[in-house]
Amino acid sequence: MLQDTWALKAQREGYRSRAVYKLEEILVKVKYNNQSCKVLDIGCAPGGWSDYLIKKYPKSSLYGIDLLDIKPVKGLKFFREDICNIDNITEIHDKKGSFDLVISDLAPNLSGIRDVDEINVHELNLETLRVANSYLN
């Protein structure tokens, strides 16, 4: 299997996926440097973004939600659940309005039918925005 440069770099540096470099770029652009933040990672599988944030900001509290299971990330409180049910997760719901950062690299399963996929992506984006607006401080 061929791997691109970013995937190889991630592997060499011990990250779960190359997606960490997207997050790193975003954090640099917005000059984010809260050393002890409370983070909600929506659609956190395979755990790469959470793993990166725990390493970069070890005093932070991280909460992750995804339909897929992930290998444990030390310091991440993980919940295997649909984002649409996030309000039913007491440990996250009790912190509503107190998160410093909400991140998401969420994507739906694609059907290959463009019209269906576009609607699913749109609906998932709207739900992600709803959650972010509700849970950010």
Locate the predicted segments by residue.
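Class I SAM-dependent methyltransferase Rossmann-like catalytic core
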Residues: 1-34
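Residue-level signature of catalytic and energy-coupling elements of molecular machines
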Residues: 23, 43, 102
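Active-site catalytic pocket residues across diverse enzymes, especially alpha/beta-hydrolases
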Residues: 30, 57, 93-96
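Conserved class I S-adenosyl-L-methionine
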Residues: 35-45
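Conserved SAM-binding loop of SAM-dependent methyltransferases across substrates and taxa
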Residues: 46-58
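Conserved SAM-binding motif I beta-strand of class I
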Residues: 61-66
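S-adenosyl-L-methionine
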Residues: 67-109
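Mobile active-site "lid"/loop adjacent to the S-adenosyl-L-methionine
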Residues: 97-137
